[in-house]
Amino acid sequence: MNSNPLRALSYKDWAKSSTENSMYDLGFDIKPIKNLVISGQMNYKRYEYKTKNYTATHSAINHFETGNPIPGTESTSPNSMSMHWISNSTMLTTLTAKYDMNFGKHTINLLAGTSYEHYNYERLYSKRTDFVSDGLEDIEQGNEVSKETPGGNSIVESKMLSYFGRVNYSYNDRYLLEVNVRADGSSRFYKNNRWGVFPSVSAGWRISEESFMKSIKWVNNMKLRASYGTLGNINNVGYYDYFQLLSSSANYNFSDTAVKGVLEAQIPNTSLGWEKVALTDIGFDLDIFNNKLSLSADYYIKKTSDILLGYNVPKETGIWSNPSLNLAEVQNKGFEMAITHRNQIGDFSYSISANIATNNNKITNLAGSDNMIQNAGDNVRWILKEGESIGSFYGLKTDGLYTQEEIDAGRYYIYGRHPKAGDLKYVPQREGVKYYCDLEKGEPEVNASITDDDRTIIGKDVPDFTYGINISLQWKNWELSAFGQGVSGTNVGFESEQVFAFMLNSNPRKYHLQRWNEENPNPNAAVPRLYGGTSLDEYNKHFSDNQLFDSDYFHIKTLSLGYMVPRNVVTKWGLSSLKFFLTGENLFTLRADKIMKDFDPESSTGRGISALGTKSIAFGVNLSF
C-alpha cells in the first residue's frame, strides 16, 4: 500500500540534483629553427555532481471501509535531508620536441618529451533529521544533535610524471630501426620505488627493396620485423596501498565494557613496485599480385612479472586486509595471422579478410603459493596454479546422474548428505574413496565421502584461439558487407540462477525441460532433478563441470546491404548524395553448446552472464546537400 502511486503524489518528499561536465584543451606548435617543432598541450576535465534529498514523515493510511489507520503504513523515522557532493578532475599536460634530419639515403627522426597527469577526487556526504517544517531546503535547519555522516567523506589524489624519448632511423626505406625509452614516476608508490624505466627497440627489413628482388615483379612488398619492449602497469595498484592505515572501527572488552579502540587496518608496504610487461614479437608482411593479396603474421611472447597478489597475513596480527606484493609471473605466447584478398572485375569488386590468433596462457610463478582459490560469484570458483592458465575453473568432475538402482545398491558417494536418484554423480580425485556399499562394518562414512579435496581443474575461460572474417562486395551502386567473429577452446561458468530453476526467484529456462525426472529418469540428462531449496537437499549445488558449458561460438555481428542512388539522378533533386541501407545486428550465432543459446556467448563468467544481445534490423537513409 505504501507504494501506491496516488499516495506517493501526496508525499512531501523531494529530490534535486545537478551535474556539470567541463573540458578545456589548449595547445601550441612552435618552429624556432628548420626541422625542429616544439609542441605543447594541456587537457583539463572536471566532473561535479550534487544531489539533495528530503524525506518527510508520512501518516498512516486509513482503511477505506472503517476509516481507521492501518498499522504499519505510517513512517517510523523522523523527516530527514541528505546532501551528496562528488567532484573529480583530471589534468594532463605534455611538452615535446621533434627534430627531423635527412642526408643522402639516411633519415633520422628524434623526439623527446615530458608529461604530467594529476587526478583529484573528492566526496562529501551529510545528513540531518527532525526539521520543523517540510518546506525548508537548508540542511542547517535540521537537528544538530542528530547530525550524521554515514559513508564518510573521502579524498583521492594521484600524480604521474613521465619523461620519454624516441629515435627513428631509416636507410633508403629498406632498413628500419626505432629505439624508445620512457621513465614514469607515480605517487601510488613509496618514494624509493616510485620510478620505473621502460625501454623498447624494433627493427625492420624491407626485403622487397633489395636489388635481388627487383626481378620478382609480382611481389609488391615483403618485410621482416622484430621488436622487444617493456611497459609498466599501475592499473592494479591502489592510490594508497603503500600507506599504513589505522581504523577506529574496533572495540575491545575491558571489565565487561566495550571500549572504542584503534587498530592497524593496513600495514605499510614500501616495497610495492611497478608491474612489468615485456613483449617480444617477430613479424612478416607480404603484399603480392598488385596488392591483391596481403598477408601479415606475428609470433609473440609476452611476459608479465611482478604481478600484484594479496599476501596472506596471519590472523593473529589483527590486520584486516592482506597486503599486495609483487609476487607473480604470467606468460602469454601465440601466433597471429591476417590475410586479405581484394580484386575488381568489371563493375564488380570485393574484399575478403580473415584473421586468426592463438594464445597459450600460463602462470609461471606464484612465489611458492601453489594454488590460490578465487570466487567468481556465489558458486563459481577459479584457481591460480603454477603451470596452468589464468581463468582455470576449480570444481568437481561428474559422470552423469545417479540411477535409482545405484542408490538402492549403495553405489554412491556422500557429500555432506546422501544423494538421491537424479543427483549428480561426483567423481573422487583422491585415492581410497569407497562406494557407500563397500564400507566395512564399523568403518566411518567419511571414507565414502566427496570432499573439497576432490576438486580439480575442470576447464578455463581463456580461449585457445580467436578468429574473424570481414566481407565487402560491391556491384555498380550496390554494396553488401558482413562481419563475424568467433572463439574456440573456452568455457563459461553459469552462476546458480542460470543453472537451477526458480533459484532466487529466477525464471526457468527451456533447457530445464531436459532435466531428470521420474517419468524420464535419464542418467545422462543435461540437468539434474529439481529439488526444494533447503540445506538438507542441496546435493547438486556444489560447483562442478555440470555448471560449465562450452562457450565456443561463431557470431555474425553485422550484415548490411546498401544502395547509392546515381549522382546524375540525385543532383536533379538538389542533393549531392543519397544512400539507402538495411542493416542487421546479432542475426545469427553458431554455438558448440545448445544450452548456451539463451545467453550472450561473449559474456564473462559469473552472475554477470547476460541474455543474448537483441537482434535488430534497421533501415535508413543517408543524404547530403
Could you tell me what each predicted segment is?
Residues 7, 61-63, 145, 186, ...:
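Extracytoplasmic gating/loop element in the C-terminal half of outer-membrane beta-barrel translocons
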